[in-house]
Every structure is written in structure tokens, then in C-alpha cells.
């Protein structure tokens, strides 16, 4: 939130720790941003919620309106079309389907999106997605693996981690080796359900 607040024509309202924002917070910051660009936009009083799929746009809309006006789900493409909802007098909030870049040249960005569920598991092999997450956890957040799985990260790599996780969770395949797809699903489900705790897959530039 602090990083985005420093960018031009941008504001960071939510950091994942502090209390949830209100409708008045949204409108007030919108007014401030509009005054920096084009004050004629104040007449329209429309705020669009847009972003990548499965990031919580509809959840935010439901929270702000204090009722379930948008369908939510733990998968991309739940929202199919635009929806206009009254926020405050003279102000409307528009929910939109998630949007992705036509092509992601940066493969690490693609994997980070896939880990969160923004890109469907059918687009990238689930084992590859989980492998990326395991390597990131071992490098950046080894304490998460220790806390959840009692696993001490080392230089033995992701394959050793999946073997140990398979033994722990009973996802052993033929030959006594880890069933990689089943074990990958376990890791991804734990991450997506918040069982690994709160942490970022990407850090702001320094």
C-alpha cells in the first residue's frame, strides 16, 4: 500500500492488515485523484473496479455495499459482465470481469499469477505451478514451510520437499515416490486458503 501511494495518480488504501475500507474512503480518495487529472469527471460519479481475475473485485463490491450483489468464487472468470451499484448519493461503483494481458513475456509473472489462481490450472501444468511456489518459499519464506509442514529448507531442492510433503500427507504414488500432481494440489490449496499465512509473491522495487 505504501509503495502504490507514492506513485503518480495512485493511492494505496488496503494493506491486508488494517481494518477494511468504507464507501466514504473510496469516494474521498477518488475525488482527490480526479482533482489531479480532470475535474469534469466528478460530475459522472462513477468508479470502476477492474483488475486481474480472481483477485477479490466482487468481494470488495459486496463488502462496500454490505450485501451480496456480486457472485464470488475461488476461480477466475466468475464475473461475466459489468454491474452498476449505488455506492453513495451521486456515486456508483461498476464491477467488471477480470482482465489479463494478451501475452505475458515475463514467465515469472505468469507463474506468480498462476499460483494465486488468476490463471487457470489448465493453462499451466499444476505441478509446474507448485514447483515454482515451493522454490520461492524455500528461498524467501522458509519459516512458512517449517511452521506448516515442519520442513527445514535446504539446498536439496523442490523435489526433496515434495517427497517429504507426500509422506506427510499420504500422497505417495507408484514406486514409493510422490504423486506430484496430488502433492502439488496440496501445496497450492494450502497457499490459496491462507494456511501458509500472509506474504507477498512479489516485492516492490527498491
Residue ranges of predicted features:
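Canonical P-loop GTPase G-domain recognition
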Residues: 1-51, 69, 170-171
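Helix-rich effector regions associated with P-loop NTPase G domains
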Residues: 9-19, 73-206
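Alpha-helical scaffold segments in soluble metabolic enzymes
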Residues: 25, 29, 59, 132, ...
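Glycine-rich phosphate-binding P-loop
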Residues: 47-66, 96
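Short, structured loop/turn "capping" segments at alpha-beta junctions
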Residues: 37-41, 62, 68-74, 140-145
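Glycine-rich, phosphate-binding/catalytic loops in enzymes
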Residues: 3, 66, 109-113
Amino acid at each position: 500500500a505504501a509503495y502504490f501511494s507514492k506513485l503518480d495518480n495512485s493511492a494505496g488504501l488496503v494493506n491486508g492488515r488494517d481494518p477494511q475500507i468504507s464507501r466514504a474512503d473510496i469516494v474521498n480518495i477518488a475525488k482527490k485523484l480526479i482533482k489531479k487529472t480532470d475535474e469534469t469527471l466528478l460530475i459522472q460519479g462513477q468508479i470502476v473496479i477492474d483488475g486481474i481475475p480472481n483477485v477479490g473485485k466482487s468481494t470488495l463490491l459486496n463488502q462496500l455495499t454490505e450485501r451480496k450483489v456480486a457472485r464470488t468464487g475461488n476461480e477466475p472468470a466468475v464475473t461475466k459482465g459489468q454491474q452498476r451499484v449505488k455506492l453513495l448519493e451521486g456515486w456508483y461503483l461498476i464491477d467488471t470481469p477480470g482482465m489479463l494481458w494478451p501475452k505475458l513475456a515475463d514467465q515469472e509473472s505468469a507463474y506468480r499469477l498462476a499460483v494465486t489462481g488468476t490463471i487457470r490450472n489448465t493453462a499451466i501444468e499444476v505441478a509446474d505451478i507448485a514447483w515454482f511456489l515451493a522454490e520461492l518459499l524455500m528461498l524467501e519464506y522458509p519459516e512458512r514451510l517449517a511452521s506448516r509442514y515442519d520442513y527445514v529448507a535446504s539446498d536439496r531442492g523442490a523435489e526433496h520437499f515434495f517427497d517429504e510433503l507426500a509422506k506427510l500427507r499420504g500422497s505417495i504414488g507408484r514406486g514409493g515416490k510422490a504423486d506430484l500432481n496430488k502433492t502439488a494440489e496440496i501445496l497450492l490449496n494450502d497457499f490459496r486458503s491462507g494456511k501458509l499465512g500472509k506474504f507477498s509473491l512479489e516485492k516492490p522495487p527498491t
